[in-house]
A protein has these predicted regions:
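Signature for HUH/AEP ssDNA processing cores
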Residues: 1-131, 135-157
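Catalytic "initiation/cleavage/transfer" segments centered on a nucleophilic residue
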Residues: 4, 19, 154-217
Length: 217
């Protein structure tokens, strides 16, 4: 389903209604409603003459998802590296602002990762970990360039590093952002986890910042 929301407050409210099986994509397809399959499954469906129900059937790929030309949501996805202590939400925000001050004054949400803040009574099994910053930008078609530029600015600010794979490859990484998410077909798995009692999630609600100002240019 393609949604059109007027501001980040509406986005925050929508996120609060998501089920564990729900995810968001900030790129859009040409259809208001569509059935999404894997690229491989879609090829089989087309070969067999369609899905038989008359609904548009697409894959989650670059062919079927694009950035909108107007206002759009840009996600900065932070997950702490294995073995390193996670940042608090406020520390993450300040780190992002120190790299790009313009974000501080633009409309954005701070959202805890979906699998965080898991409790069993008074015992916290998993507290703060990853965070998402969801910002409103003027032109969705500029997100790919803006994301690349933000990662480069992180490196200039000293928060880039080289990750060594098991086979010795050197991969550039950024402490504040996953560079791969600046693609229209990427999913944000922001629905809550399935918790079996006595486990429960006490994840803070998305924090709305600067809802009434203009988007990031």
């Amino acid at each position: 389903e393609r949604l059109q929301l007027k501001d980040i407050t509406e986005l925050a409210k929508k996120m609060a209604t998501l089920a564990p099986s729900n995810a968001l994509a900030y790129g859009v397809s040409e259809y208001k409603h569509a059935i999404i399959h894997t690229k491989k499954a879609l090829a089989v469906i087309k070969k067999n003459g369609g899905n038989g129900n008359g609904k548009p059937t697409i894959a989650r790929d670059r062919e079927h998802f694009q950035w909108p030309e107007g206002k759009a949501t840009m996600m900065i996805d932070y997950d702490p590296e294995k073995g390193t202590p996670p940042m608090s939400g406020e520390d993450f925000l300040e780190a992002v602002y120190s790299v790009c001050q313009e974000i501080r004054h633009a409309p954005h949400l701070l959202v805890p990762s979906a699998s965080t803040f898991i409790y069993e009574g008074d015992k916290c099994h998993k507290g703060s970990a990853g965070w998402r910053l969801l910002g409103v930008v003027s032109h969705g078609t500029d997100i790919k360039r803006a994301g690349k530029t933000f990662v480069e600015m992180c490196w200039l600010a000293g928060v880039g590093f080289i990750f060594f794979t098991k086979n010795g490859r050197m991969l550039p990484r950024c402490e504040l952002a996953d560079a791969s998410v600046f693609q229209p077909e990427r999913l944000d798995f922001c629905g809550p986890p399935i918790c079996t009692p006595p486990l429960e999630q006490r994840r803070p609600a998305p924090q709305v910042l600067n809802n009434d100002v203009g988007p990031l240019v």
